[in-house]
Amino acid sequence: MIPKKIHYCWFSGEDYPESVLKCMDSWKRLLPGYELVLWDAGKARATGIPWVRGALERRRWAFASDAVRLYALESEGGIYLDTDVEVLKSFDGLLERDYFFGYENGSKRIEGAVMGAAPNSPAIAKALDFYKSHPFRYREDTVDDFVLPNILAQAFVDLPDLEIFPEHVFSPKSYIDGKIRLQPETLCVHHFASSWRAPCVQRGIARRQWLYAKFPRPVACCLAGILSVWMNFQNLGLAGTLKKACGMLGHSRKK
């Protein structure tokens, strides 16, 4: 059984922005009786995980939280939420499970922003092993190699019976056009703040969403593709752009 705990990470020590406060208010209103468990930088370092230590030293907060959320669920159990997740309905109906995961909007990858597990879950422990055995590394052109959804996919490859909820349950907001498509089963919205990406990538995401808001979808898709290639070339160079394109092609073939 999953305990009534909401784990979240905040490592910078800065005040919460208004968007985070809004999301946290939804947790308190709609999840009464749940304990909110903050994992700050000091508590994260105390895990002793090499990946966490390296990510904190480089102020890559989101990558530190990838490992910390797994550690929290494996050691204490509960539900992990990114601070840009807005809760719409109670999670009580999920607590009898050993774990729960959902798909990320539009990608068929496991959503890392919302997950839950009972303590000592073998599935969570298997994913956590990656972070325990690897030092932290980060380059924008290789980021897709070790983002949490891909680590989870690798860890769960031998768990064919793992149930994963459809994207509209936890991730109804489109990463592509920014639109939120709610359904009766939707429990929360991951707003994709993308604070972990480089500033140039964040600008590219904003421009792509602007294109989808201004043009018909086929036109926007074409223009967004051109924009993506141009942005990758500017930031990664020719070799990095080709490597990223090959990686995306390989991921597409695996689906």
Can you describe what each PLM-predicted range is?
Residues 1-65, 83-255:
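Glycosyltransferase-associated regions of secretory-pathway enzymes
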